[in-house]
């Protein structure tokens, strides 16, 4: 896969212009007035801890601003997600927030919503080839670049394994593009060698374990770095490492899930990417209310989804390693000190200010 194919349209975001977003025209649906806005939140899964946080944060913000919210979870089933969204539309929601399982298939959800004049916000994962009204996410390509740059900064030479996420998730492709944009010059110089590069089906830890075991076998355990795209795949990869390599092989991650941050402070996982969820969820809810009321949403970036340059609100990711745990997830209240360090002798715990 060439790393430039999806990066070129994404460079539009660097222009940092402001797009004034309004909901879909037509469809016969009246703009919601001053009454409570009814938001339908369609989620792919609650399996990972981070998605549980998304759900809680969306519900919290809806309660704070007086919006009504109904959450539907598809459990990784495209047909179920489509049916659930149809059900939400039948119930008369004013706006849909969709975290798609499959960004391609979810295009039909956008079409169905627009036929009823209901705007759609693509949440965290981009819905492809559809007239999405707004995309709310983190800077996904940048996350991949941050993972790869961290790896290169700490392991400048050696054999690398790259583990992506689900190929049905556009974010997995963008992450890999970001990683390769940083790693390719080092590959060309002969400094590093990619000995395995695979996508983990459904982001499964078991898939990451299999990929890592295979790479270890084929390379006689001679692996120096594993660029895992999220914490679930990082955990799977670490499970595959023989004891003498745990803590020696660099392993990246993403999401700052509790188990991953525990691994970071224990020296098993080298780093993760912390993506504060509340700003993401809050901006989605606030934007949903504006769209439902026909008000303008200021979106400073645009991301191409194969059909349009979608107005986008992108949050900044943060590198997390053992050196800044206290200044990030602990300080923000994302995790508790006693939970993060529970497997570390108490006399080695840092002091909490």
Predicted regions and their residues:
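A residue-level marker of the well-folded mature domains of exported/periplasmic proteins
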Residues: 19-353
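Bacterial N-terminal signal peptides
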Residues: 9-16
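Residues embedded in well-ordered secondary-structure elements
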Residues: 8-9, 308
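Bacterial N-terminal signal peptides that target proteins for export
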Residues: 1-8
């Amino acid at each position: 896969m060439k790393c430039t194919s999806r990066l070129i349209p994404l460079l539009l975001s660097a222009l940092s212009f402001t797009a004034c977003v309004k909901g879909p025209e037509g469809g016969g649906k009246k703009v919601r007035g001053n009454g409570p806005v009814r938001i339908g939140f369609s989620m792919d899964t609650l399996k990972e801890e981070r998605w549980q946080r998304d759900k809680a944060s969306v519900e919290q913000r809806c309660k704070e601003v007086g919006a009504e919210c109904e959450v539907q979870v598809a459990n990784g089933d495209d047909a179920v997600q489509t049916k659930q969204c149809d059900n939400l539309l039948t119930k008369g929601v004013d706006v849909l927030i969709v975290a798609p399982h499959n960004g391609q298939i979810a295009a039909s959800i956008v079409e169905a919503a627009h036929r009823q004049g209901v705007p759609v916000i693509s949440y965290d994962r981009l819905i492809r080839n559809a007239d999405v009204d707004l995309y709310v996410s983190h800077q996904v390509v940048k996350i991949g670049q941050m993972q790869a740059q961290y790896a290169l900064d700490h392991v400048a030479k050696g054999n690398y394994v790259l583990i992506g996420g689900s190929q049905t998730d556009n974010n997995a492709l963008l992450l890999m593009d970001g990683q390769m944009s940083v790693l390719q010059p080092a590959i060309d110089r002969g400094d590093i060698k990619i000995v395995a590069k695979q996508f983990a089906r459904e982001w499964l830890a078991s898939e990451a374990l299999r990929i890592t075991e295979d790479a270890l076998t084929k390379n006689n355990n001679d692996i120096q770095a594993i660029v895992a795209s999220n914490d679930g795949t990082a955990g799977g990869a670490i499970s595959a490492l023989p004891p003498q390599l745990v803590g020696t092989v660099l392993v990246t991650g993403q999401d700052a899930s509790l188990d991953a941050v525990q691994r970071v402070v224990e020296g098993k996982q080298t780093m993760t990417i912390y993506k504060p969820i509340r700003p993401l969820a809050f901006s989605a809810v606030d934007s949903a209310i504006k769209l439902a009321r026909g008000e303008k949403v200021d979106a400073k970036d645009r991301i191409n989804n194969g059909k349009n340059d979608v107005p986008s609100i992108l949050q900044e990711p943060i590198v997390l390693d053992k050196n800044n745990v206290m200044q990030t997830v602990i300080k923000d209240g994302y995790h508790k000190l006693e939970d993060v360090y529970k497997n570390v002798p108490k006399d080695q715990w840092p002091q909490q200010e």
